[in-house]
From Swiss-Prot:
Protein name per UniProt: Dematin
GO terms under cellular component: actin cytoskeleton; actin filament; cell projection membrane; cortical cytoskeleton; cytoplasmic vesicle; cytosol; perinuclear region of cytoplasm; plasma membrane
Function per UniProt: Membrane-cytoskeleton-associated protein with F-actin-binding activity that induces F-actin bundles formation and stabilization. Its F-actin-bundling activity is reversibly regulated upon its phosphorylation by the cAMP-dependent protein kinase A (PKA). Binds to the erythrocyte membrane glucose transporter-1 SLC2A1/GLUT1, and hence stabilizes and attaches the spectrin-actin network to the erythrocytic plasma membrane. Plays a role in maintaining the functional integrity of PKA-activated erythrocyte shape and the membrane mechanical properties.
Stored Gene3D superfamilies: Villin headpiece domain
GO terms, molecular function: actin binding; actin filament binding; signaling receptor binding; spectrin binding
Interaction with RASGRF2: annotated segments: 225-309
Length: 406
């Protein structure tokens, strides 16, 4: 009877639950004993941390299970009192049926209650997973990455089983999945992104390329010297063969054939400039050399009459034929006169407002002043055709209106 009246011993920070049998494991009835005081679960949060309290788990994370060390007499006398003592960081699994049978038998009361009264901690299985540590390579955190494991495993084999995956892994090591060009200077590698190559590396590369270019130029000059010697020898042979031919016609034919067989070798740096601006400039000056003096200045300024505005032809009245006339063919004139423009007296070219006057055939209605002779032109406009061509378009039109030529 002393054993029945004896209260169960608990640790200083133990949690005991007075639960109803109908509701096993209810968190609302959990209490904790500390310094001979019974504390509810809500009061545990107000306890300062410097108290000597063992680890008390939250009720929603605790495993509630009946203790298996009580006897039949305890079940009769105390039907609703159950205890559960928690040792630090330890939980107990549910007992097996054999243990239940031994604990319920009356002969095992002292044996079952003896370890409980002693208060020794119980060993239990952990509620979380531990990785296997039997093998040294079982820890996944100490293993190399997967692609390195595959590279090590397939490194000895001549052909990989997954060439596409290996190619992707290999290309992922380079920025933009492009390996660097071995001919280019290496870039500076940082933690963020590869920087441009250093100036020292660029300078050395530039010096190497410059030296290689100098060597190539020297080789080219040597080849030119060799070719010059070959040309001299070939010319000497030609002279010997020409001296053997007696007839003049045979000499001419043989000379032409030999000139065709000569290798045409020219350096690009010795060739003249062939840019469009250069050619158009030279073409403009060559064309204007055969023209009169008053038309040469405007043509050299415009360089070509094909791209001049509609009034540019009026600036050069001396363009009588040639390229200037061909440039006006695409401006709507039906039948341009390729030959020299005809000269008419001033009275035949006058335009009046009274009625539509008949102009001579083949006359340009927009440039009637070109059909005037030099004497009539100076008499009507009081200036030379060269001075008239230097005036602005609106000024020329005003003068032509006054002279009834517009």
């Amino acid at each position: 009877m002393e054993r029945l009246q004896k209260q169960p011993l608990t640790s200083p920070g133990s949690v005991s639950s007075s639960r109803d049998s109908s509701v096993p494991g209810s968190p609302s009835s959990i209490v904790a004993k500390m310094d001979n005081q019974v504390l509810g679960y809500k009061d545990l949060a107000a306890i300062p941390k410097d108290k000597a309290i063992l680890d008390i788990e939250r009720p929603d994370l605790m495993i509630y299970e009946p203790h298996f060390t009580y006897s039949l007499l305890e079940h009769v006398e105390l039907p609703r009192s159950r205890e559960r003592s928690l040792s630090p960081k330890s939980t107990s699994p549910p007992p097996s049926p054999e243990v239940w049978a031994e604990s319920r038998s009356p002969g095992t009361i002292s044996q079952a209650s003896a370890p409980r009264t002693a208060g020794t901690p119980r060993t239990s299985l952990p509620h979380f997973h531990h990785p296997e540590t039997t093998r040294p390579d079982s820890n996944i955190y100490k293993k190399p990455p997967i692609y390195k494991q595959r590279a090590e495993s397939t490194g000895g084999s001549p052909q990989s089983k997954h060439p596409i995956e290996d190619l992707i892994i290999e290309s992922s090591k380079f920025p933009a999945a492009q390996p660097p060009d071995p001919n280019q200077p290496a870039k500076i590698e940082t933690d963020y992104w590869p920087c441009p190559p250093s100036l020292a590396v660029v300078e050395t590369e530039w010096r190497k390329r410059k030296a290689s270019r100098r060597g190539a130029e020297e080789e080219e000059e040597e080849e030119d010297d060799d070719s010059g010697e070959e040309m001299k020898a070939l010319r000497e042979r030609q002279r010997e063969e020409l001296s053997k031919v007696t007839s003049n016609l045979g000499k001419m034919i043989l000379k032409e054939e030999m000139e065709k067989s000569l290798p045409i070798r020219r350096k690009t740096r010795s060739l003249p400039d062939r840019t469009p601006f250069h050619t158009s400039l030279h073409a403009g000056t060559s064309k204007s050399s055969s023209l009169p003096a008053y038309g040469r200045t405007t043509l050299s300024r415009l360089q070509s009459t094909d791209f001049s505005p509609s009034g540019s032809e009026a600036e050069s009245p001396g363009l009588q034929n040639g390229e200037g006339q061909r440039g006006r063919m695409d401006r709507g004139n039906s039948l341009p006169c390729v030959l020299e423009q005809k000269i008419y007296p001033y009275e035949m070219l006058v335009v009046t407002n009274r009625g539509r006057t008949k102009l001579p055939p083949g006359v340009d209605r927009m440039r009637l002043e070109r059909h005037l002779s030099a004497e009539d032109f100076s008499r009507v406009f009081s200036m030379s055709p060269e001075e008239f061509g230097k005036l602005a378009l609106w000024k020329r039109n005003e003068l032509k209106k006054k002279a009834s030529l517009f």
